[in-house]
Amino acid sequence: MSAQTSPAEKGLNPGLMCQESYACSGTDEAIFECDECCSLQCLRCEEELHRQERLRNHERIRLKPGHVPYCDLCKGLSGHLPGVRQRAIVRCQTCKINLCLECQKRTHSGGNKRRHPVTVYNVSNLQESLEAEEMDEETKRKKMTEKVVSFLLVDENEEIQVTNEEDFIRKLDCKPDQHLKVVSIFGNTGDGKSHTLNHTFFYGREVFKTSPTQESCTVGVWAAYDPVHKVAVIDTEGLLGATVNLSQRTRLLLKVLAISDLVIYRTHADRLHNDLFKFLGDASEAYLKHFTKELKATTARCGLDVPLSTLGPAVIIFHETVHTQLLGSDHPSEVPEKLIQDRFRKLGRFPEAFSSIHYKGTRTYNPPTDFSGLRRALEQLLENNTTRSPRHPGVIFKALKALSDRFSGEIPDDQMAHSSFFPDEYFTCSSLCLSCGVGCKKSMNHGKEGVPHEAKSRCRYSHQYDNRVYTCKACYERGEEVSVVPKTSASTDSPWMGLAKYAWSGYVIECPNCGVVYRSRQYWFGNQDPVDTVVRTEIVHVWPGTDGFLKDNNNAAQRLLDGMNFMAQSVSELSLGPTKAVTSWLTDQIAPAYWRPNSQILSCNKCATSFKDNDTKHHCRACGEGFCDSCSSKTRPVPERGWGPAPVRVCDNCYEARNVQLAVTEAQVDDEGGTLIARKVGEAVQNTLGAVVTAIDIPLGLVKDAARPAYWVPDHEILHCHNCRKEFSIKLSKHHCRACGQGFCDECSHDRRAVPSRGWDHPVRVCFNCNKKPGDL
C-alpha cells in the first residue's frame, strides 16, 4: 500500500496533519486514512505502523483534496448502514478522535472535555467534493447503458426466439461467466410497464418500446441486460389486453415469473384492485404445484451447477396514484405490507411461493413520475442473496428452455380460465380417457420422458374399447400383479407345434411365473371361463393413441400365412436369377430385329436408372430402345413398324414425336415381319397368364384380410409407410409391425423381436420405433 509520495500529492490537504505521531512529531501532512486504525497518517507513520504483522492487512485509502474523515464514535452503531456513515466536523486533539456534530454534543458538551482543543474540518469543501463524485458516478452509469438494446426472448406463441445459450449471451451482451439476477415486470396493459423499466434501469432511454396508441406495443417477452446493476431485465405483455391465444400468453407469464429473482407488479390505479391479488395468489399456487417440481428436475436433467431455489421470487408492488393517498397513509401505525397480507387473506389467496412481498408507492401530483424510491428498493433487494443467488446466464436460459419444453402446446377453448388466472388445465396433460372422459393428472409432455398417463379416479368398462386387463389370480394372491393375455400358443411351443396344439385345444393364457394356466378347449366339454378360475379382471383407462387391451390376439391364421409366404419367398429368391436369365433369352429370340437385346440394356434410355435383377425392362415399339415403366407408359399406333392401328407401348420421346413418320424401308419391314408375329403371339400368351394371376390375387387378398389380427391396420387403409412416409407401389411392399399393427416398408421394419403381449412369443417383424422400446413388448 505504501509508496513514495510525489511532490504533487503534497499540499492537497494542508489542514490535515498526521494524527498518529508514530514516526513523526505530528506536524507532517496526512496522506493516508486507515479506517481500522481510526486515524489519518503521514507517509512515514503509515509505512512504519503497517510493517507490523498484526496491522499489515489494514485497509488504507489515499486522501483526496478536501477529504473529511468519518466520525469514530457513531461508526458501526445500529442504524447506520455502510455508505451512510456520518462525516466528522471536528477532531479532538486530546482524545485523538474524529467527531460528528451529534457525537460532539453528546460527549464534549460538558465537564473537562469541553475545554479540549479541537481541529475543525472544512465541511463545505467536502459537500462540493461529494456532489462532484456523485455527478461523475451518475455520468459513468448513464454511459454504461448507452448501447443497451432489447431483444425478443419469447414470442406470443410461447416459442423461444434464441437458438441456444451462446445466442442468448450474445444478445444480452454480457460475459458468459457473469453472475446476474433476473428482474421482470407484470401488470395490466397500458399501465406503463415498459416506461417504468426504462426510467428505473436505463435512465429514461427507450430500451423497451413504448407507444401512445391504443394498441399494445409489447407482444411476447422482451429482455435486456443492465450492466450497472448486473441484472437481466424482462418486459412482459400486459394483462387484460385484447389478444388472441389469451390462455397461452397467460401461461407464458408464469414461466417468466418462475425464472425471475425479483418481480415488479406495476399498477397505475388510484386504489389496488382485486385483480392484482388474484393474479399473485393464483401464480403462487400454480408455481408451487407445477413449477417447483420441474425446476428441481431441471437441475438434475441439465446438470446445472447452481441449485434453483424452490422459493419463488421477491415481489414489489409499485403503486402510482394521482388523486388518492398511498396505502397505509391513513394507518401510520401499520406497515403497508401487513395491509397487503390482509387483502390476500380476505380474498382467500395465499402467496406462499414468494419469498417476500413489498409495497412501494408514489403519488404523482405533476408529471414526471418519481422512480427513485422504486430504484432504491430494488437495489436493496438485489443485494440480498439469502434466497436467490446470482447465476450464469446459461443457467437462466436452461431453466426457461426446460419450462417451455414441458409446458407447451395449444389450450382448447373449453379450458379457458374463468375463475382463475392459472388453472391446472394450463399445465397438466390435455389427454382424456376415451372410456370415462377423465383427464390425465400428469404434467404436459410427460410422454417425452416415458411417463405413462395417470388419472385420479378409476375407469368404467366400455364394450367399444374392451378396456379389461387380465391378471394372474395365483400371482395376485402372492402379492404380485402380473398381466396375462389370451394368445394362440405357449412361449415354449415351436411355431408349427403351437399351431397344431391351437387347432386341437384352442387358445392359451400363459403367466410368466405359473406357465400355461388355461386352455380354451382343454376338455371336450365343461370348459370354464378363465375369469371364474385363473384370472382376475381389472378395468383400466383408454388413452388416445392406445389400442384395446383384450383384443383378439389369436394369430393362428396369420402365422400360417407367414409360414407359407416365407417358404414361397425362399423358393422365389433362389429361382429368381435363373428364371430371369431364361426369360430374357426367350424374349430376345422372339423380339423384332430393331429391338435392342435385353442383355445390352443396363439402364433406362431416358432417365438412366440402372436396372436391378428383378426389374422389368420395356421396349418402345417405335424406336426399339429399352426403358423403365414410368418412361414408357404411353401408347399410340405404330403402323410403320408393322404393329397395325392398335395402340402399343412407346417411350415418351416417340409419343411426343408421333406426327413425325419414321423413314422405314420396305426391306426393313419384310425383315421384321417374321419376328414381329412371334412377338405378338408371345404378348398374347403373357397377357392371358397375367389375367389368370390377377384373378388369383383377388381371393388371396381376401384371405389375407380375413387372417389379419384385429389390431392390424387393414391393407386398403395403408397408403404410405408409417415411418418414412414413402408411398406403397407394386415394387414397395406393405409389412405390418407385430407390436403396433401399423404398415411399414421393409427398410423401416426389418428388426425381429418377440411380442408376447400380442401373442408372438418368437421373434417376428417389428418396426423401428417399437424396437427401441425398453422391456418386453
From Swiss-Prot:
Keywords: Endoplasmic reticulum, Golgi apparatus, Lipid droplet, Metal-binding, Mitochondrion, Repeat, Zinc, Zinc-finger
Region called Required for localization in the lipid droplets, residue ranges: 416-777
InterPro entries: P-loop_NTPase, ZFYV1, ZFYVE1_first_BBox1, ZFYVE1_second_BBox1, Znf_FYVE, Znf_FYVE-rel, Znf_FYVE_PHD, Znf_RING/FYVE/PHD
Organism of derivation: Homo sapiens (Human)
Protein role: Plays a role in the formation of lipid droplets (LDs) which are storage organelles at the center of lipid and energy homeostasis. Regulates the morphology, size and distribution of LDs. Mediates the formation of endoplasmic reticulum-lipid droplets (ER-LD) contacts by forming a complex with RAB18 and ZW10. Binds to phosphatidylinositol 3-phosphate (PtdIns3P) through FYVE-type zinc finger. (Microbial infection) Upon SARS coronavirus-2/SARS-CoV-2 infection, mediates through binding with non-structural protein 6 (nsp6) the replication organelle-lipid droplet association required to sustain viral replication.
Binding site for Zn(2+) 3: 721, 724, 745, 748
Coiled-coil boundaries: none
Protein name stated in the entry: Zinc finger FYVE domain-containing protein 1
PANTHER family: AGAP002036-PA, ZINC FINGER FYVE DOMAIN-CONTAINING PROTEIN 1
Keyword check for Metal-binding: yes
Primary subcellular site in the record, as a coarse category: Golgi
Phenotype upon changing residue 617 to A: Drastically reduce PtdIns3P binding. Abolishes PtdIns3P binding
Residues the record lists as binding Zn(2+) 2: 620, 623, 651, 654
Subunit structure and binding partners: Interacts with RAB18 (in GTP-bound form). Interacts with BSCL2 in a RAB18-dependent manner. Interacts with ZW10. (Microbial infection) Interacts with SARS coronavirus-2/SARS-CoV-2 non-structural protein 6 (nsp6); the interaction is independent of PtdIns3P-binding and leads to endoplasmic reticulum (ER) and double membrane vesicles (DMVs) binding to lipid droplets.
Entry GO CC: autophagosome; endoplasmic reticulum; endoplasmic reticulum membrane; extrinsic component of omegasome membrane; Golgi apparatus; Golgi stack; lipid droplet; mitochondria-associated endoplasmic reticulum membrane contact site
Positions that bind Zn(2+) 4: 737, 740, 767, 770
Pfam families from the UniProt entry: ANCHR-like_BBOX, FYVE
Binding positions (Zn(2+) 1): 604, 607, 628, 631
UniProt-listed GO biological process terms: cellular response to starvation; lipid droplet formation; macroautophagy; positive regulation by host of viral genome replication
Highest taxon, organism lineage: Eukaryota
Zinc finger (FYVE-type) residue numbers: 598-659, 715-775
Gene Ontology MF term list: 1-phosphatidylinositol binding; phosphatidylinositol-3,4,5-trisphosphate binding; phosphatidylinositol-3,4-bisphosphate binding; phosphatidylinositol-3-phosphate binding; zinc ion binding
Cell compartment(s), UniProt: Golgi apparatus, Golgi stack; Golgi apparatus; Endoplasmic reticulum; Lipid droplet
